[in-house]
Every structure is written in structure tokens, then in C-alpha cells.
Amino acid sequence: MDSSTPQNYLAVIKVVGIGGGGVNAVNRMIEEGLRGVEFIAINTDAQALLMSDADVKLDVGRELTRGLGAGANPDVGRQAAEDHEEEIQEVLKGADMVFVTAGEGGGTGTGGAPVVARIARSLGALTIGVVTRPFTFEGRRRSNQAENGIETLRDEVDTLIVIPNDRLLSISDRNVSMLDAFKSADQVLLSGVSGITDLITTPGLINLDFADVKSVMQGAGSALMGIGSAQGEDRAVKAAELAIASPLLEASIDGAHGVLLSIQGGSDLGLFEINEAARLVQEVAHPEANIIFGAVIDDALGDQARVTVIAAGFDSVSQETNANNSSPAQRQAESTRAAFGGDASRPSGLGRSPQRGGNSYGAPAAGFGSRQGQGQDDDIPDDAGFDVDLPAEADAPSSSNTSARKDSLDFPDFLK
């Protein structure tokens, strides 16, 4: 092989967005300039598919639904994907890693994502699902379909990251529009994918590669991920604190047997602060966890430090227990804030209403992670490090606003 073509040695990463929500998420990733991956859009809605800028577009509804969508019926979505199994297999060939992203609860994404994941794994690719759980206001039927879809997908992927959209409301303004809420969900899906691909595609002082990611995520089941950034004194520790204490995921990284840890900063990033950040993460993982560490020097970050934590390999996670009890991760984060000061942990440049549209590599890292519970500590940045157009400090939606009428809401396919 010609040694002048090093790109041939790079891991082949493909991101598949299936259904309206998944295709919207892929479009968002393309807009933000996510690099080093191939984008594939799959849908039963031909019109929505035409609007995608993905490298590969696959209409799986041209016979079964005549390109008109799955009508929020997961059985139709599953059948459509199975009818085009050979085409899906063809576009996934050669991939080392496949991300399957979708908005759970609709038809095409909910029913088709497990089919895509099964095909990807059968081809030998490390297969990671990154999906959203629907907002409560989308209705009980959609919620039930989402839960069934998540459980089915979990059996077909190596690792599954589930992002509950309702948690976005905890960092949203009461006046946020429904369209902006769904765009914010797309941003979180982007964060889930880029947080992993960056570890592989960005050269490091201490390198992480595809084999490192695979050793933690292959057959790992559920995974939790956090991305935090901070500036100023003790920036690496504060970034690590944000990475393990975000309000957006439903469980804690406590007891993880596998952890990927990447710390990025300028050339002045100090050994002591790297050590402190790594120690913070180590203390909340399993005592015998396989912790793989990488450090990237990027002068474009300036005074900013960025920490990415991916935790997987849990013995068992009781979400009810996590929701009601303070975890070691939370207690560690709280003690760190007490030692270093709270408000300083807000990443510089991330105000209450940050601007959308910046490049995901030059902008402060969009982050989400493992803090269960919400609104418990005013020192956590209100936007939790996310580059989304959501002003902070809103109450969670009241359960009294949920009614039978919402169960029958008919959402346009581009929001499914």
C-alpha cells in the first residue's frame, strides 16, 4: 500500500439519521461542520429527504408508503427498512463505526432504527445508538412507542445513549417555541456523536484511537457521556465537573467499568490540572474501571479547557434510585465547587442565551452528561455548557398540563 495515502488508515465512521428526527439531526451535524464522518439519511418521507444535505439519501418508503411517511406507525417504519435491507447493507459496507440516530416515538425512526443497527452489527461495525426520548407534551402514545423502540434498539446496538427531551425544558425559558425545542434536541444529538468522533479524528498529545473507543463501547449496553468546558483558574477540574454533573441525562456514571477521558486545552495546559481532572473522574467510576485517557493540545481553545467523559459498562442502574438519592458523582462535583467556587465554572462565552451557528470545533463544547436530578445547585451553569438558543431558568413542565388531548396531537413528519 502506498504510504503517501494515510487517509486509508483512518477509521471509517458513518452517521445514519433515520426518520424525520434523525434526518434533522444529521442536517444539523452537517451545518455545524462535523468532520471525518459520512452522513446517510434514511426516510419514508421523500419530500423531507430531498431537503437533506447528507452524502447518501435512501428513500425506503417509495413502495410501501409511496414516499408519504410512516404515519407515526413503527410497524410501517420497520417494514420499510426491512424491504430495503440490501440497499441499507450496501451503504453501510466498509464502516468501522456506525452511529444510528433517531427521534424515538414516531414511525420511521422508531421502527427502522433497530433494523439499521442490526445490519450494521452484522457487517462487523461498532454500532452506537444516539436517540431522543420525546417531550411529554407529545402525548402518551408517542411516549409508549418510544419506550418500546428504545428497548428494541438496545438489543441491536453495542452501546445506546438515550437523551430525554424533557430535560431540555429544565434549562429552557418558558417562552421557548416548540420549533426551537426540537432544534435543541438536534443539538444534543450532535453533541452525542461529535463527542465520540472527536476522540478518534482529532490528533492528540496522548492519542485516543478507534481501538480505545471500541474497547470501552463494544457490547457495553447503556452509556453516559458528558462534555464540559471552562476557563480561568482550575479550568480542567471545573470542565470535568461539568462533564459529570450535567442535568440532561437520567443516571450517574457511578460504577462505570469503562471510561474514555479526553482533555483538550492550549499549550499552557498544566500537568497538575490534567491530573486533578482525571482524578475527579476516576473517583466516581468503578474502583477497577478501565480508564483510557487522552490529551489534545489545541491552541485555538485559548484559555479554555474541554473535558469529554464517556462512561459505559454498568453492572446495573436503577433510575428510580438515581433520581431520588445523591450520588458520589454529585457529591464530588459539589465538593469541587465548594473548593474552587461555583459561578466560575460557567464556560466563558456561554451566557444565558448563546448564539447558534458557530462551528462545533471552535465554539465552547456542547455538553451533556450524568447528573441526575435538576435545579439542585445554582452553581451549575444554567445552560449546562450547551450551544443552544435556550435561555435558562425555566420550571419543568407541570404534569397538570398533560391531558388526553395531547395524546392525539398529529405532529408533522419533519418533527418526528
Swiss-Prot record:
Q: Which domain of life is it from?
A: Bacteria
| Subcellular location field | Cytoplasm
Name the InterPro entries on file: Cell_div_FtsZ, Cell_div_FtsZ_CS, FtsZ/CetZ, FtsZ_C, Tub_FtsZ_C, Tubulin/FtsZ-like_C, Tubulin/FtsZ_2-layer-sand-dom, Tubulin/FtsZ_GTPase_sf
Q: Where is this region: Disordered?
A: 319-416
Q: Does the keyword DNA damage apply?
A: no
Chief subcellular location: cytoplasm
What PANTHER family is this protein classified in? Answer: CELL DIVISION PROTEIN FTSZ-RELATED, MITOCHONDRIAL DIVISION PROTEIN FSZA
Q: Which family does it belong to?
A: Belongs to the FtsZ family.
The name this protein carries in UniProt is Cell division protein FtsZ
Q: Which gene encodes it?
A: ftsZ
